[in-house]
Amino acid sequence: MLAAAKYRNLDPAFVERLAQEAAERFRDRGQAVKYAKRKLHQAFGAFVAGTPAQAVAACVAKIAAGAEPKEAGREAMRAHASSAERVDWLEPFYERVAQWCGPASSVIDLACGLNPLAVPWMALAPGATYACYDVDRTMAEALRALGTVYPVRVNAAAVDLVAAVPAAGVDVALVLKTLTTVEQQRGGRRVAEYRRELTAVQHHSDGARSLSGRRGYADDPDAIVQRAVHGTGYEVVDEAAFGTEALYHLVPLAGTAGRPAPAEGAAEPGATRPVVDVPATARPDADRVDPTG
């Protein structure tokens, strides 16, 4: 699978996990390969609309040459299908996140795609740290250069989030359009584990449509959020909608982790506050095997 041009730059551990899972599930090699390709498409192929790494490099070069960061970032984000869906409401989207979170000194962006290009819209404290992770090694390498043109310290790496979630001891964690993919990869139980590993979930954003725009998911946004949050010690206290996305504000339940409950509508001091976003009410393109293999 790594021999295919589309997938050769993916995190080897991610591909090896899928190959091992396919081999354990199917004795027939053809069926195993088909299964693994479907999982690759669900987690990566369905979201690529161009050449993300090249788009990031071009964005950095334009900003360094004097281009307006928001204009350059918005253009580059169109090289990633999932990130591209958010370009029309970036400003109100992150204004609401800022209202809920306040200025953040540290951010972790899981399954980031090209969302780090949205830094100019985010409420970040001076010198903030922005750590971003995806399965594409070349894209992660390109994203590191954002630290040369954005007023943040950028760390980027290729990580298989289903196998291990990076430590989230930060102010805000962004997990955009990822919960459904995690469910497809490992099932609902793994989603609960995924949420617990994030330590403190404060926001959740769901896509109202798939990449194709078709409706028909068995679950709606509320169902996915409630299932993901169940047993984590957090509750939904507010929500908002932008275009095809729904945001959910979560805070710790009273007395969890030995701490008192925060004031109504406020985040608990010192807690990580992720924004999580997944397609929730439409059957995604990711359900199909990638015909290009």
UniProtKB/Swiss-Prot annotation:
Biased composition (Basic and acidic residues): 284-293
Substrates-to-products reaction catalysed: guanosine(1405) in 16S rRNA + S-adenosyl-L-methionine = N(7)-methylguanosine(1405) in 16S rRNA + S-adenosyl-L-homocysteine
Entry's Gene Ontology molecular function annotations: rRNA methyltransferase activity
Keywords (A to Z) from UniProt: Antibiotic resistance, Methyltransferase, rRNA processing, S-adenosyl-L-methionine, Transferase
One of the GO BP terms on file: response to antibiotic
Residue ranges, compositional bias (Low complexity): 258-274
Binding annotation for S-adenosyl-L-methionine: F47, H80, A81, S82, R86, A111, D134, D160, L161, L176, Q185
EC number: 2.1.1.179
Region (Disordered): 258-293
Gene3D superfamilies xref list: DNA helicase RuvA subunit, C-terminal domain, Vaccinia Virus protein VP39
Enzyme class at the top of the EC tree: transferase
Role noted for this protein: Specifically methylates the N(7) position of guanine 1405 in 16S rRNA. Confers resistance to aminoglycosides.
Family to which this protein belongs: Belongs to the methyltransferase superfamily. Aminoglycoside resistance family.
Note: Protects M.olivasterospora, which is an antibiotic-producing bacterium, against self-intoxication.
Protein's recorded name: 16S rRNA (guanine(1405)-N(7))-methyltransferase
Organism: Micromonospora olivasterospora
Classification lineage: Bacteria, Bacillati, Actinomycetota, Actinomycetes, Micromonosporales
